[in-house]
Amino acid sequence: MIFVGYFFNRLVLPMAFLVFLSVSSHAMDVGEARHLLQRVAFGASPAEVAALVELTREEAVDHFLDSLDHPEFPEPPPFVSRPRPDYWASGWESRDMILQHVAERDQMQAVWISHMIATPTPFAERLALFWHGHFVSRFDPGRVSAPLFDQIALFRREGGGNFRVLLRDVLRDPMMLTSLDNVWNTSSHPNENLARELMELFTLGIGHYDQRDVREVSRVLAGHGVDFEGGWRYRFAVDQADTGEKIVLGQPIAAGSQDQIDRLTDILLAQPQTAEFIAGKFYAAFVSIRPNPEATNRLAGVLRDHDYELRPFLRALLLSPEFWSPANRGDLVKSPIDLVVGFCRSFGLTPPDAMVLVTYLDKLGQTPFMAPSVAGWREGTSWLNMKTLVLRRLVVSRLWDALRVADRTPKPGDLAVRFSSEFIMVPTVFTVRVNGAEVATVRQTIGLDLQKQRSQGDNGGLKPMWETAIIPAKNLPAEIRNVEITHVSNDPDSRLFVNWVEVAGRRYPPQLSRWSPSDAPCAGAPRGMFYCNVGLEFDIAPFDTQQATIDDLRADHNSHIEYTTARLQREEVQDAQPPLEQAFDMMMARVGEGSVSRENLAGQWLLGRPVLSARAEKPALVPSVAQPVAQPIAMTMQPAGNTGTAERGAALIDLLRSMTTDPQYNLK
């Protein structure tokens, strides 16, 4: 038996590993590139796939690991850079203060979702989201805002570094100390919340500690809090600390040390269960929801052998046979953020208003900073049931609507009106007047047909998607002093929602407007929401954009209009993705035209399988849920030579759109 074990370990395992290496040393195909991108990024654009198919697995993985050295950070909302208030000062539970901090949360959500869509370093963002779901801090109930933005920056900066360093920093992070009540933990009045979650959710897992350990860890953490009046920064209060000796998991922490967190961290990471727990969470998030103790133990060994350096661990994870096993492809369910952000990145959609995406995410069950509990979001098949599958299809339909009008970008000197609409039978129409003279009549393109949507299972839960009307500069006066939007539909079921008017690169949201006439039947509605034929007037004057976003924090709240986030303008992405058909053809050229049909390439790209293969090739993750809403994939495209360019492009869009209604699109 000893000889057999020796033979297996010394000869068979190395040979198997060499076989794996020889296979993975070849350039990846589209399916492999898509698989890697779906796991380490969000979605997979044709350009990203085309760039990876020339690389081996090792080269591609190293590319993503190298990107962790220089993650891109989003421009913070202006309020984040201002002096931090005492969030719990007198009056903090007043309606005005609650709404202001909710508006701050909204701005942070809009910025982060926009950054996920646009970032050139998506792996860093993927890891930041992973750690956000591991070291959970929540906006509610304390309604502390700016420190949440700082915490995500910490995850972005250190999420691919060393877990020991990350854990130490998290235990001194103002948002973590606030969210888990350690700001109230003192030697005389212990609070055990952070101590318990540190062991149960962050390191050891359930069953590997006892209540005595919880008490001792809470003693270590006593005095670690924030300076409420000093910018809500981390503070270690010596007079509130317990500097006596502690025994944690049988290991001593010497008395007298002012700060014992580092020693506590070393004790926790010395336990084999910690490496196994962390490896297991990564395996479930990046490889498969089906536990694999053998693979997890092997990866845990990599963590321990490298003193919890995450880079070699991530490399071992992403190059493991389990990661690339065909059995584990399409084995993970896309979270709502995966679905929405992944669609936007895959198809090159960068909407100027991100809060509508956040509202879709809320309906689907996942918005940043709003995890249901300190345990984070339930993953895997918990995302899918009959209701959420219908909602997901409706959300994807809204995103296709946005993509349909995504090329409407104002040029310098143009006037832009950002609006959405609802109607029954008769499309919404409005006029635009500048300085009293009519310059345009606008008819909605992607408005929401309420009757049609109700028949598809949407009972008003999802807002219509924004679109942009553009009046070219040649139709405008040299100086714009006043803009008036007037709803002119004679249909009482027609509704218009105006999010902003843009003049000279500045956005004017409805809170800066007034109804005209002021006594119109629907003038009591929030400004920007047209329920009758009425005008909305904007006076156009210069303003400071940074200050405006601060002022907007005190704007009214509304379920449709993005009052508090409309003026969060980010830099336009230069050298953005080419039009979808062009990007797809570039991917096809890289793969090799003639080697695969457009239909099969599209299937590999979006669904991870050729569309002509049997639908039952891989069993659905939740067949009883997914199969009833399956839609047939259109495969009626004609050869390129038999159709015109426009028809060929339309056929491609129809094909891709049909694929995104397939239940398989919810898997990655």
Segments predicted by a language model, with ranges:
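Extracellular carbohydrate recognition and processing domains
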Residues: 440-476, 517-525
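N-terminal accessory alpha/beta regions
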Residues: 46-158
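Bacterial N-terminal signal peptides
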Residues: 10-22
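Short beta-strand-plus-loop segments that form exposed binding edges in beta-rich domains
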Residues: 485-492
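Flexible, low-complexity segments enriched for small/polar residues
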Residues: 28-46, 271, 275-306, 314-410, ...
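Active-site substrate-binding loop specific to GH73 endo-beta-N-acetylglucosaminidase modules
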Residues: 92, 105-112, 144-349, 355-359, ...
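Activation corresponds to long, low-complexity, non-globular regions
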Residues: 410-413, 425-426, 431, 440-441, ...
